[in-house]
Amino acid sequence: MSSWMASIPSPGPEWAQIHLPFLPFRIQTYALIILTGIVVAAMWTSRRLTKRGAEPGVVLDVLLWAVPLGIIGARLYHVVTHPADFFYPGANVWNPFQPGAIWNIWEGGNAIFGALIGGAVGVGIGCRWTGLRFWTFADALAPALLLAQAIGRLGNYVNQELFGLPTSLPWGLEIASGNKAIPVGLPEGTLFQPLFLYEIVWNVIGVFVILWLERRFRLQWGRVLAVYLIWYGLGRSYLESIRIDPSEFSFLGIPSNVWAAFAAVVLGAIILRVQAQRHTGLEPGPYLPGREWVSPQAEVESGETDPEEILHADDDEERTGTHKPQATSLSGSN
């Protein structure tokens, strides 16, 4: 090709795992990338919540529920939508000490839509526990989540996952010939659409779009989350339609992930409409009534007496010999 880029090479299998001599096991590169995305999202979400008046670090109390349930949801969704990968004659379905079990998330197979469902349940529990408004937390999380998803797609690149139909474009992705997702009959050296890269670009653009719309229209009450759902659903519906995933369950000839992307768009539109009708003003604060957190600085400024000031006042009275008269008790009780 005369183009400046002939193709995008994929990392070799040695990149998929990291071996440290002092550890008895290998660390999955994909897991480290996902962890990086979670940390970035947590830090940014915490900053956005703190600006709204939430307690610093409260995001960790919510993520304590959201992350584990998100991981469980991601795995369950993948198992349900890819039954042929787990349920076949002679398959090891349940034994986690053998390859192929449904519990073995380190072998790959985690779905973002399942993570969103499980994570949403976890956020609901965490917000109820901390007293945060669900919509406030969801709005603070939305752009950070999209950025975390962009980071996570680098893990798909390392694992040679999430690629699309064959292409002759100069940025076609090289995939090892032994990859099980490659359709039978394609010639050696066939290049594929780098869907992981497309989604990274789409998600990063979406972060800026969400932030601009949030500031331009002062979006609250879950409407930032709604924009996230619409944006991500639109992009993912197209990418899934050109993705090669032969084991994915389909309904009416449409892959399950495309249906999930459509559902995300519809849900986002419903949230926008319903919340615009129910809440015309701004949120009164990040906490539910009666669950508010008051910062130490605010307590001092509210007029509460500092114990040190009382001690200093007593010392001044002793030096000057002046004392304030004590109020006489009318009830006679001590």
UniProtKB/Swiss-Prot annotation:
Broad enzyme group: transferase
GO CC annotations on file: plasma membrane
One example GO MF annotation: phosphatidylglycerol-prolipoprotein diacylglyceryl transferase activity
Record membrane topology: Multi-pass membrane protein
Highest taxon listed in the record's lineage: Bacteria
Pathway it works in: Protein modification; lipoprotein biosynthesis (diacylglyceryl transfer)
Entry-linked InterPro entries: Lgt
Keywords, ordered alphabetically: Cell membrane, Membrane, Transferase, Transmembrane, Transmembrane helix
Entry similarity comment: Belongs to the Lgt family.
Role, per record: Catalyzes the transfer of the diacylglyceryl group from phosphatidylglycerol to the sulfhydryl group of the N-terminal cysteine of a prolipoprotein, the first step in the formation of mature lipoproteins.
HAMAP family xrefs: Lgt
Name of protein: Phosphatidylglycerol--prolipoprotein diacylglyceryl transferase
Provenance organism: Leifsonia xyli subsp. xyli (strain CTCB07)
